[in-house]
Amino acid sequence: ARSRSRRSYGRGRRRGGRRRRRRRRRRRGGRRGRRSR
C-alpha cells in the first residue's frame, strides 16, 4: 500500500503540480482583473 501511494503521489505531484500551478495563476489573474475593473 505504501509503495503504491508513493508512486501515485510522485506522479500526481510532478504532472498535476505543474498543471495545477499554471491553472491557478490564470484563474487568480482573471478573477483579480475582473474585480479590479
Curated annotation (Swiss-Prot):
It is found in: Nucleus; Chromosome. This is Protamine Z3. Its main location: nucleus. It comes from Scyliorhinus canicula. Residues 1-37 are annotated as: Disordered. The keyword DNA-binding applies. It comes from the Eukaryota. Testis. Keywords: Chromosome, Developmental protein, Differentiation, DNA condensation, DNA-binding, Nucleosome core, Nucleus, Spermatogenesis. GO terms for biological process: cell differentiation; chromosome condensation; spermatogenesis. The keyword DNA-binding applies. Coiled coil: none annotated. GO terms for molecular function: DNA binding. One of its GO terms (cellular component) is nucleus. Protamines substitute for histones in the chromatin of sperm during the haploid phase of spermatogenesis. They compact sperm DNA into a highly condensed, stable and inactive complex.
